[in-house]
């Protein structure tokens, strides 16, 4: 059993690295009118991890133990599986249900064997966690450079809508399918880094946020402690700058919401240490502003250096215009001296977009509205939905989308449309159970704020295979 326990730990160690490969490399197994059949590294990890969990549970005779205590948790996945029977896309429904059960088994395994997460495990896990995050940040920067110098997309792995041709500067997607997924993948490491910085110097037992990176024998004023604090700030700058470079409104908005809740929560719970906590909060917001300014300058510089006719100022203007939904507008008539001596821009290409892309927002709102329209069309659909995996087919059949592959780009509307009022009600019950469980953990502030950030981000997309980290990472971070 010791070998299995060790293997279990190794699987959890590599999970943060595995989830970053959410789309590339991908194993393409086939295609149909309504979906692509693909296998990614996170899915392979999930299957192998579940096989290990089953073996461990069988050896310890835990597979069906405490079933009476877990039955409420199973109501939601059972209902989703039943809804496949009337799904308008049976194959997609079956595959989606399979992934959901794999996730449930993985999370149950993490909970069942949580005693393996000792202090040494937490220390090693954070090394893997932040190490993988820094590597992916470097990959994103490299991706931008490769795109600017004209390296083909099949080598840079940047998506078609992410190249400099769109806005005049590239926005990286790493090994994910789109920048919004890359930005979403950075939410967890960024918020964990924030949590460690704010809680690092709390001293009273009541308010202290335990920092797994701290070692015995070193006080808050020691040289090693100060070095760790500096490295923590540099880590946060790298993560935040990359997050802003993804140019993903959904991920950036989600981060800001999660950060606001975390800061407010930790200040509220600080008690007598509130003054110290407020200083750390101020430091974090200073780092956020610095990182945003750094990313903004990098995007402006990339616009100046790109083959398009964009300038530093037009690049900055486009970023601010897009992130503020067209509210902030900067006129690009006057010359800018910041980078005029760096390079003479002789680009003749014209970028596709001049700023805020209303079509992106309109498409999301249109699909969400179409989903709600179908859901409310009759009592049966309102109560039971069109079946798991059937949202795209339902939109197409009702002439509300151009192809059955089109999906509702809002996870909540998608769940409502596919599983009906019953499914949403069971989801709410599951969330309540999860929150009650998380509130008993030391890292409750971190995990709940991360879940809030993920909840906000799910308003901008839907789908399981490219976002397994949303469900797996909180299950492990709960035990930091």
Where are these regions (language model features)?
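Aromatic-anchored transmembrane helix interface
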Residues: 70-76, 90-112, 124-133, 156
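Hydrophobic transmembrane alpha-helices and their immediate junctions
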Residues: 108, 206, 396, 418-454
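Transmembrane alpha-helices of multi-pass inner-membrane enzymes
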Residues: 49, 258-263, 447-459, 463-480
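Alpha-helical transmembrane segments of multi-pass inner-membrane proteins
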Residues: 9, 78-84, 123-160, 164-168, ...
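A juxtamembrane structural motif centered on a specific transmembrane helix
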Residues: 1-9, 199-204, 227, 278-287, ...
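A membrane-periplasm/extracellular boundary helix in multi-pass inner-membrane enzymes
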Residues: 138, 144-147, 245, 266-355, ...
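N-terminal signal-anchor transmembrane segment
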Residues: 1-57, 81-86, 253
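Long extracytoplasmic/lumenal interhelical loops at the membrane interface
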Residues: 353-419
């Amino acid at each position: 059993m010791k070998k299995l326990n060790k293997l279990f730990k190794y699987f959890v160690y590599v999970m943060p690295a595995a989830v970053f490969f959410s789309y590339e490399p991908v194993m393409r197994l086939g295609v149909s009118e309504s979906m692509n059949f693909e296998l990614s590294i996170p899915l392979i990890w999930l299957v192998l991890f579940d096989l290990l969990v089953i073996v461990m549970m069988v050896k310890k005779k835990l597979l069906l133990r405490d079933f009476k205590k877990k039955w409420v948790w199973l109501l939601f996945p059972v209902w989703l599986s039943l809804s496949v029977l009337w799904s308008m896309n049976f194959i997609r429904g079956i595959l989606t249900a399979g992934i959901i059960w794999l996730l449930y088994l993985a999370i149950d395994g993490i909970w069942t064997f949580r005693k393996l997460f000792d202090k040494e495990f937490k220390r090693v896990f954070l090394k893997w966690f932040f190490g993988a995050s820094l590597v992916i940040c470097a990959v994103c920067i490299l991706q931008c450079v490769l795109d600017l110098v004209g390296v083909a997309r099949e080598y840079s792995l940047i998506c078609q809508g992410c190249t400099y041709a769109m806005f005049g500067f590239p926005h990286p997607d790493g090994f994910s399918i789109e920048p919004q997924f890359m930005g979403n993948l950075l939410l967890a490491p960024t918020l964990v880094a924030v949590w460690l910085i704010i809680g690092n110097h709390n001293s009273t037992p009541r308010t202290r946020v335990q920092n797994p990176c701290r070692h015995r024998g070193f006080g808050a004023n020691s040289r090693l402690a100060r070095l760790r604090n500096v490295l923590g700030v540099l880590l946060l700058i790298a993560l935040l700058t990359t997050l802003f470079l993804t140019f993903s409104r959904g991920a950036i908005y989600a981060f800001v919401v999660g950060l606001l809740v975390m800061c407010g929560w930790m200040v509220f719970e600080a008690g007598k240490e509130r003054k110290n906590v407020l200083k750390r909060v101020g430091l974090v917001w200073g780092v956020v502003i610095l990182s945003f300014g750094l990313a903004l300058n990098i995007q402006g510089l990339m616009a100046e250096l790109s083959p398009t006719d964009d300038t530093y100022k037009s690049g900055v203007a486009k970023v601010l215009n897009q992130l503020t939904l067209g509210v902030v507008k900067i006129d690009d008539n006057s010359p800018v001296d910041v980078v005029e001596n760096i390079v003479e821009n002789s680009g003749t290409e014209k970028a596709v977009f001049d700023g805020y892309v209303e079509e992106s927002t309109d498409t999301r709102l249109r699909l969400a509205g179409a989903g709600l329209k179908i859901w409310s069309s009759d009592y049966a659909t309102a109560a039971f939905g069109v079946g798991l995996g059937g949202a795209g087919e339902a939109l197409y059949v009702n002439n509300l989308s151009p192809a059955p592959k089109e999906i509702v780009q809002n996870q909540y509307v998608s769940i409502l449309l596919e599983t009906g009022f019953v499914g949403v009600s069971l989801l709410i019950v599951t969330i309540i159970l999860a929150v009650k469980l998380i509130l008993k953990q030391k890292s409750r502030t971190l995990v709940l704020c991360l879940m809030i950030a993920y909840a906000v981000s799910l308003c901008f997309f839907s789908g399981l295979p490219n976002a397994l980290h949303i469900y797996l990472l909180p299950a492990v971070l709960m035990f930091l």
